[in-house]
């Protein structure tokens, strides 16, 4: 088996995790207490869904996941929630005091105490796997725990599980909506380690997803649950092929191979279609070309940046439901014929497609309508650099006055780490610029960086 372990860090990671596991359980017919009435082979571990769930001899299905937070309130909601019997109690790890929006607390002081417990759990989970394929890491980089503890854990995973893929689903601070003053610091410090210790990162941004909820689902004031439902649909679509047997399956390592042209350029945009409320769904039909066109719409991107400002290097289209390869080929050909969607000149094909016949499920009482087919796209576009330059700009404004820096230094960080991380991001922006530049004749000079 090719198992995958999910790691949910900090409040954002855990709440997105709740939505995801709720959806996985629905899709596989697993009850909130972990039983699966439809599973004929009790205790045997060779069904496709065993990539995400391990199975006990009594027929209980346990998520291969760890929830990790420095303070207990969010994890306590999982401990007392609907799915409390689903998770192994030792997989829900919480500390006593939180990181207070401070990267240094999550990374150096408070986080250090909890990270070994977490690695111990991960080691046990990994021992239960026959062929561990990699990790999915869910966190946000604006707060203290997601950024600080998230980075610390990624660094330790690189040491303990060197060659295993690490895919990040990371919530980046939004341009207009901010939840903490020091977000730019935490994001820059944390991106510094995402650059080195993850293989692919899918950028998500609350503001972009708010806009999608408002526009497409007619929710006037979207809550985090609305956002997380949409995020979990996207993540579910990306992992469908790992959990079900499909027509064209896509492995975790295939994402890497097809999407990452250079090791540092691994930050992806994602989009999902059709996002439609139940009220409207009756009156519309969504053909494969239609949903394919809409995942390329700038307004459907789950991060605030405009793909028209950049060029695509590669994209992965994951279809699910009633879709046949012939439709996909036609739709992709139509996209290629469009002049609006630009690819870099050194990557002429640029499309990787996956198809899975399992139709999308929806959470009862959720916002999304039940549809016959859906598509999720992850794309590598040079416009992602906009996200970084925005955060860098805010970082510079604060750091030029050394505002708030003493909180970080007081927790055992050195000022040098700020400038080091900032320089790394400046180099990243430059990398994106060069990759998107015309012609590939300057490749030889680029070679020294990697």
From Swiss-Prot:
Residues 431-450 are annotated as: Disordered. CDD domains: alpha_tubulin. One of its GO terms (cellular component) is cytoplasm. SMART domains: Tubulin, Tubulin_C. Keywords: Cytoplasm, Cytoskeleton, GTP-binding, Hydrolase, Magnesium, Metal-binding, Microtubule, Nucleotide-binding, Phosphoprotein. GTP binds at residues 11, 71, 144-145, 179, 206, 228. Its cofactor is Mg(2+). The modification Phosphothreonine is found at residue 349. It catalyses: GTP + H2O = GDP + phosphate + H(+). GO terms for biological process: microtubule-based process. It comes from the Eukaryota. Its main location: cytoplasm. The active site is at 254. It is found in: Cytoplasm, Cytoskeleton. GO terms for molecular function: GTP binding; hydrolase activity; metal ion binding; structural constituent of cytoskeleton. Coiled coil: none annotated. InterPro entries: Alpha_tubulin, Beta-tubulin_BS, Tub_FtsZ_C, Tubulin, Tubulin/FtsZ-like_C, Tubulin/FtsZ_2-layer-sand-dom, Tubulin/FtsZ_GTPase_sf, Tubulin_C. PROSITE patterns: TUBULIN (PS00227). Belongs to the tubulin family. Dimer of alpha and beta chains. A typical microtubule is a hollow water-filled tube with an outer diameter of 25 nm and an inner diameter of 15 nM. Alpha-beta heterodimers associate head-to-tail to form protofilaments running lengthwise along the microtubule wall with the beta-tubulin subunit facing the microtubule plus end conferring a structural polarity. Microtubules usually have 13 protofilaments but different protofilament numbers can be found in some organisms and specialized cells. Tubulin is the major constituent of microtubules, a cylinder consisting of laterally associated linear protofilaments composed of alpha- and beta-tubulin heterodimers. Microtubules grow by the addition of GTP-tubulin dimers to the microtubule end, where a stabilizing cap forms. Below the cap, tubulin dimers are in GDP-bound state, owing to GTPase activity of alpha-tubulin. This is Tubulin alpha-1 chain.
